[in-house]
Amino acid sequence: MYTFKISTKKNKKYDVFKNGKYLVSFGGIKPDGTPYQQYYDKIGKYSKYNHLDEKRKDRYYQRHGKKAVFESAKYFSHAYLW
């Protein structure tokens, strides 16, 4: 159903496609080109930036909240990076 590709946007990690049609981009990349760390990259292209720190993961959810609109960038970040 979903296909993930390295993003064509310089400040995003992934582009999401649904049935071949672009849906959304998600995951942050700093202005210097370095990806922000995530808890665990389930897609795997940025797994060297996994931190696996439970407390940091909890702080992320405290800042951003646990609820996300279906098929939004936040939804995919929560499902595939956090």
Region annotations inferred by a language model:
Residues 1-82:
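Arg/Lys-rich, low-complexity, intrinsically disordered basic segments
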